[in-house]
């Protein structure tokens, strides 16, 4: 890519650093931000090949050490180099595209593993729907910079294009995969390498007709990758735009294959209110009734489950409560935040208020009951999932969603594809 004119949705092949086939299942790891350090230490017991040794390298150091200590990033870089040296990882000789298919509970999604442009991140061709936090960006900037690589893929989506689907489908049918394994959570992972130049050209050209890509998951990773690329440009003022640091590792999925799960909330107290006072206050904004099933999972938008004192309630928002014409304010996560968590419980900033926590739908509503019954939390709220159409519309409008609006399953595994910035 040169500094002048360019086309939209530029994707390009790359020489992946990736595990040898027989080690792929052991290498593949959940994303760094899904596990805390203690959980990661447990996961890697007996597995020296887990990519968590790169993505969360503090697990190989003194537990008293901060995960943001310089030594953690240095250890990550050392561990990646060691994997390459020991030939746990190889690097493909020629640039290629890759297909990455995940199947969970009978539902498959097939993504194209590519490099995308930091310029398109910067000019909003790659659209966002979340704000990022500086300290989280800084963590991944340091990680990418020291490792000299994008180690975790950015999960991108695009409005479905039949031509792309057809090419991916036919390639899968006609070629043997490079990886196939079922992870411990039952998700099946299969990958193919697309090395045929004519097919690569066809796919690259197909994306030039796609006006936008959208970040589904990985706002901090993408922001960090783009910033490292800009840092490298400053260090290399004669850059051409074709160097690897101008691009970052992404997996592109058609929007209609993705599954957003519920992202639920638990709160530690009722802001000094008795249960009776709390129930009375929320009737300003919601119709409240005892649920006829337990646990209660909302089956349509604008309805919520609430678990308190061993009882489930169904909440239905009153129409006059919110502006139905406002894309963001009309989201279920916004309605709960604006009119219950903020107005009644005075939890105004869910990012920083320790009185609220978030529970991904993968953990089930029984987890909400367990947390409240333990006494650690006073109430739990189950939500109807945000839709893909809402995500795309909000990103198109240049708006941002409230924190913790979307929980995607299945999670992409890290370590199957690494993009070197060299």
Where in the sequence are the language-model features?
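Surface-exposed, charge/polar-rich loops and edge strands
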Residues: 2-422
